[in-house]
């Protein structure tokens, strides 16, 4: 098990590293060369600044029972398809019961924006998001530990 962070624009990294350290779980952060990320705990891997470069590196380096942290539903779907677990930086767990709906809603929002419509953005990150991320990341790590034993 390792934690893989889609690092371009990932809030909550301090919480993720705190939980990772607590459980001695290796953390990999993938980001483009345009995002300078420094960490005393996580291994930062820089990738080219191409379209969806980080997404493809995350997907290609994810294996069964890894935990992927991403706000991208497509990356989450690829991780789930490989037998990994996925969670958003706000602490929402992606699973096989909700990923299809989330992808469909994303499609509808994109279609609406292309037609000139507006879509509502995310709310400002708050303590509830931090608490949810901490708690649900703990849940996922314990789930993987239970599967592995």
Swiss-Prot record:
- Belongs to which family? Belongs to the UPF0178 family.
Protein name per its UniProtKB record: UPF0178 protein CPR_2251
Q: Which residues form a coiled coil?
A: none
């Amino acid at each position: 098990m390792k934690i893989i962070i889609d690092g371009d624009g990932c809030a909550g990294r301090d919480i993720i590293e705190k939980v990772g350290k607590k459980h001695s779980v290796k953390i990999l952060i993938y980001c483009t060369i345009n995002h300078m990320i420094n960490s005393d705990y996580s291994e930062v891997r820089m990738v080219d600044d191409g379209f969806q470069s980080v997404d493809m590196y995350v997907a290609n380096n994810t294996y069964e029972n890894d935990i992927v942290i991403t706000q991208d539903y497509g990356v989450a779907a690829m991780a789930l398809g490989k037998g990994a677990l996925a969670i958003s930086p706000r602490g929402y767990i992606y699973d096989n019961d909700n990923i299809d709906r989330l992808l469909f809603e994303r499609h509808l929002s994109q279609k609406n924006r292309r037609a000139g419509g507006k879509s509502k953005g995310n709310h400002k990150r708050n303590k509830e998001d931090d608490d949810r991320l901490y708690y649900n990341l703990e849940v996922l790590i314990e789930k993987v530990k239970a599967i592995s034993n």
